[in-house]
Amino acid sequence: MPLLDSFTVDHTRMSAPAVRVAKTMKTPSGDTITVFDLRFTVPNKKAMPEKGIHTLEHLFAGFMRNHLNGEGVEIIDISPMGCRTGFYMSLIGQPDEQRVANAWKAAMEDVLKVKDQNHIPELNVYQCGTYEMHSLAEAQDIARDILSHTIGINHNDELALPEDKLKELQI
């Protein structure tokens, strides 16, 4: 099985909260697609609670679009990582990491302004696969935690696993 890009970086050296350009690629028509790793918690130290990350998924996607779309950027998708330590954000364009960090911070401030669960988008049996698995309180705790820190930048060259380590780890 091919080694995915996300597994070529050393998760033991990642900081959080932090933005990382996980991948860039060109479409056949010449557009740039950038995938960002938005790392909320330090891997293998703390995972976001499942109800909180699910609620955050519903809120974060819209709030990030409000703060980041425009000036050559259009978000395609924001999805939680299976490890529950962050989100992947795919977009058209190449905003710098600080612009993404600023939008992320503004989105977390928006999460704190949500008054109750009735204001969570698509929170119903028709639009959500596990609509009863939500917690606004947990999502707001996650947002408060992010806002209590400076959002840093993780650099691939500083996190790259050496070739010998990759060979050692291959199954």
UniProtKB/Swiss-Prot annotation:
Protein name: S-ribosylhomocysteine lyase
NCBIfam families: PRK02260.1-2
Binding partners and assembly: Homodimer.
Cofactor dependency: Fe cation
EC numbers for this chain: 4.4.1.21
Family: Belongs to the LuxS family.
SUPFAM superfamilies the UniProt entry points to: LuxS/MPP-like metallohydrolase
Sites where the protein binds Fe cation: 54, 58, 128
Keywords: Autoinducer synthesis, Iron, Lyase, Metal-binding, Quorum sensing
